[in-house]
Amino acid sequence: MKAIVVNPPNKGVHVKEINDIHRSLTADEVLVKTIANGICGTDRGIVSGLLKFSRPPNGKNDLVLGHENLGQVIDKGPEVHGLGKGDYVVSIVRRGCGKCSNCLAGRQDFCETGEFVEAGIRGLDGFMREFYIDNASYLVKIPDEIVDIAVLLEPLSNVVKAYSELMLVQRRMTWWCKDGSYNCRNVAIVGSGPIGLMFSLMFSIQGFNAFVLNKRDPFPIEAEIVEKSNAKFINTNKDRLPNTIDLLIDTSGYPSAFIPLMSRLNKNSAIILFGTTGGEKFEVNADLITYLVENNILLFGSVNASKKDFENGVNYLTIWKYRYPSVLNRMITRVIKPEQAPEVLYTKPKGEIKTVISWV
């Protein structure tokens, strides 16, 4: 079968024929036909050779790329319940170490040993291939009503997790407004990629005032999505920023993009660091640290998601499709065939929000 493979940590990507579906299913396994994969910055980081933590499975030279996925059940083992042939599914990405208490409790996104594997990223083949076998416990069933946007579920699950973490830690004090809503709270989201736009949707629907920040004017599709979600796009090179910020979310990974905004943070506010990149150096002085301390400002990083976050993401996709018709579909800016993937993985097309590989 056809697959898109890399040889991390080396640079490069190619489409090749592989033959790794050559055994019978165990009782709790499922055979899945891949329908679509999303392409994200992590995939491009692996292809470029910049993500040095990426590695193939033990005993293999190549890694099948791809962690954003949508598939359809083709066959299943006799002990698989709740899934039937023809059902649409999304596989979760991270698989636990099997040792620490978090992994044993289904929260591999908080693995304490670091011995986890991640499909298409480190130690486990991913989903950019025609078929794959997975344990049923790692699959999330997708309602037919959202199949057209379900390839967005994996990135959304990360947003769902970060939002739930924020609401948990902000219970340290009264954070809602006098009327019990959040309409007095300003959220500044640095970056207007798919994750930034999903954060915008998440906080807008919860009643926050969401601002999407970039150092340029929005592309037409970005402007449309932000406007329809009742958020506001800000070009930080020319537009006025909100006077105060109650939540700062960085999806860019560039310190120079978000650290200068910290001085605008309100008392008792929070910072979520989501984006990752390498190389840039940016000075943080003692005055800024003092400001964070004296104003009870909380900072935390967030990565990956649990199966429950995926399941909650299904609910959000269902609600958003009804609340914001066409917005989520517009995030998928290009659909390509597997043979076209290497070119797009090397170079991000201008105006891209989400490029999707179609296997059907």
From Swiss-Prot:
Broad EC category: oxidoreductase
Cofactor(s) the protein requires to work: Zn(2+)
Chain positions recorded as NADP(+) binding sites: 192-195, 214-216, 274-276, 302-304, 348
Binding site for substrate: 42, 118, 154, 158, 304
UniProt protein name: Glucose 1-dehydrogenase 3
Catalyzed reactions: D-glucose + NAD(+) = D-glucono-1,5-lactone + NADH + H(+); D-glucose + NADP(+) = D-glucono-1,5-lactone + NADPH + H(+)
Annotated positions binding Zn(2+) 2: 97, 100, 103, 111
Details of cofactor binding: Binds 2 Zn(2+) ions per subunit. One of the zinc atoms is essential for catalytic activity while the other has a structural function.
GO molecular function: D-glucose binding; glucose 1-dehydrogenase (NAD+) activity; glucose 1-dehydrogenase (NADP+) activity; NAD+ binding; NADP+ binding; zinc ion binding
Domain of life according to the entry: Archaea
EC number(s) recorded for this UniProt protein: 1.1.1.47
InterPro entries named in the record: ADH-like_N, Glc_1-DH_arc, Glu_dehyd_C, GroES-like_sf, NAD(P)-bd_dom_sf, Zn_alcohol_dh
Keyword annotations from UniProtKB, A to Z: Carbohydrate metabolism, Metal-binding, NAD, NADP, Nucleotide-binding, Oxidoreductase, Zinc
Family as reported in the entry's similarity comment: Belongs to the zinc-containing alcohol dehydrogenase family. Glucose 1-dehydrogenase subfamily.
Matching Pfam families: ADH_N, Glu_dehyd_C
CDD domains hit by this protein: glucose_DH
One GO term (biological process): protein tetramerization
Encoding gene (name): gdh3
Function comment: Catalyzes the NAD(P)(+)-dependent oxidation of D-glucose to D-gluconate via gluconolactone. Can utilize both NAD(+) and NADP(+) as electron acceptor. Is involved in the degradation of glucose through a non-phosphorylative variant of the Entner-Doudoroff pathway.
Residues reported to bind Zn(2+) 1: 40, 67-68, 154
Organism of this sequence: Saccharolobus solfataricus (strain ATCC 35092 / DSM 1617 / JCM 11322 / P2) (Sulfolobus solfataricus)
Region forming the signal peptide: none
Transmembrane segments: none
